Regions:
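Ligand-binding pocket segment of bilobal, Venus flytrap-like solute-binding proteins
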Residues: 187, 194-274
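Pocket-flanking alpha-helical
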Residues: 55-59, 77-113, 122-133, 228, ...
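Early extracytoplasmic/lumenal segment of secretory-pathway proteins
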Residues: 25-27, 35-106, 365
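Short beta-strand->loop
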Residues: 114-122, 136-138, 166, 244, ...
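Periplasmic solute-binding protein
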Residues: 101-112, 132-160, 188-196, 278-284
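A structural signal for short loop-to-beta-strand junctions that line the ligand-binding cleft
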Residues: 91-96, 114-149, 166, 176-182
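Mature extracytoplasmic/periplasmic domains
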Residues: 283-342
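C-terminal motif of bacterial Sec signal peptides marking the signal peptidase cleavage site
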Residues: 19-23
């Protein structure tokens, strides 16, 4: 997509002076090449660069099914999807993971997947099953793109942080927000889509004109926005950043706590939960998979309670399985987003380029 929290976490960890969690797949993990599963005992997962899982969870899959997972990492989600479209019918693996709701229609329109109803799908939240009638893809995780705020800044100024998109237009928040370019960054695109969802196709342009007049700053990507411009992040504090509002993720506060040394008792950042856009990531059985049985077993596993409970601290996303428990770090420091903004995947596919062009002409010309 697509630069979700998972893609950002390595940069955030670097800013905090430590290494991010290692990639999964062990000696079978690859970043290029591949011709699908080489044997019936290997199942190949094609993914964006930031798929991650604990070794114990991967070993449990092998013990339960007899299949060993090979992870073929292929850049960000958009680049990975493009490669699968180019190899349609002769896929590089058995399962593709990483198409989110901003890319879903493109993947489905290109006929990349063989329908399969994963075991345990009835335990998956109904609002994430965007292809429920055909089962071409299986929901795996959700995440929310939201404005984050620097708690210290607002406490020092005795100013309440913003809560909604409308709040960001108020004079009190002039010259405080930094966001990412919607044409080059997934969180930037998600924030734009959030304004389309809340203001409508007839109102989002007027919103952005007002936001520009209120001093919004636009930079190329998440790393620059969060680690260089945002005063609430570890990197921003080192850089003496002066923007206390940034477009990031609802899971950014737990990440700040997890990678801090020593760990604080309170997250230094908060989330404006009325500014969030919901992302849903999917996996699907690739049409022409060499190990279809292994691919089906892997899809079943991706929505198992074991894998779902492993995801939050490895990929910094939320589980879609209703009985999966969040780790205490997420419960204590994460934000609960009850009513995220959403846009139908087919509407995104039809209008994304037009929305981004209009946004660019208004904001970055």
């Amino acid at each position: 997509m697509n630069n979700t929290t998972k893609y950002a976490v390595t940069a955030l960890a670097a800013a905090l002076g430590i290494s991010a969690l290692a990639g999964c797949g062990g000696e079978d993990d690859e970043s290029a090449g591949g011709e699908g599963s080489k044997s019936s005992k290997t199942v190949t997962l094609v993914s964006h660069d930031s798929f991650n899982a604990s070794d114990a969870v991967l070993k449990a899959f092998t013990k339960e099914t007899g299949y060993k997972i090979k992870v073929l990492k292929s850049g960000d989600a958009g680049a990975a999807l493009n490669q699968e479209i180019l190899t349609k019918g002769s896929p590089r693996g058995d399962v593709f993971f990483g198409a989110d709701n901003t890319l879903l229609s493109r993947a489905l329109d290109n006929g990349l997947f063989t329908p399969y109803e994963a075991k345990g799908l009835d335990r998956v939240a109904a609002d994430t099953r965007l292809d429920a009638d055909k089962h071409r893809v299986t929901p795996v995780d959700t995440g929310d793109i939201c404005v984050n705020y620097d708690k210290k800044y607002f406490a020092d100024k005795k100013l309440d942080p913003p809560k909604t998109f409308d709040d960001l237009l108020k004079p009190a928040y002039k010259n405080l927000l930094v966001t990412e370019n919607a044409a080059t960054s997934s969180p930037g695109l998600g924030f734009l889509l959030g304004t389309v969802a809340t203001r409508g196709e007839d109102g989002y342009q007027d919103y952005w004109k007002k936001l520009k007049d209120n001093g919004v700053k636009v930079v190329d990507g998440w790393e620059q926005a969060y680690n260089d411009e945002f005063s609430g992040s570890a990197g921003g504090r080192k850089a003496k950043a002066d923007r206390p509002l940034v477009v990031s993720y609802a899971s950014s506060p737990p990440v700040e706590v997890l990678y801090a040394d020593p760990q604080p008792t309170e997250a230094p950042t908060g989330v404006a939960t009325g500014t969030c856009f919901r992302q849903i990531e999917f996996a699907g059985l690739l049409d022409g998979a060499k190990n279809e049985a292994g691919g089906k077993a892997l899809l079943d596993f991706l929505i198992s309670k074991r894998f779902q409970e492993d995801m939050p601290l490895n990929m910094f996303v939320n589980p879609v399985v209703k009985d999966a428990k969040l780790p205490e770090l997420f419960k204590k420091f994460g934000a609960t987003v009850d009513k995220p903004a959403t846009v139908a995947p087919e509407q995104i596919a039809e209008n994304r380029e037009q929305w981004v062009r209009s946004w660019s002409s208004l904001v970055v010309k």
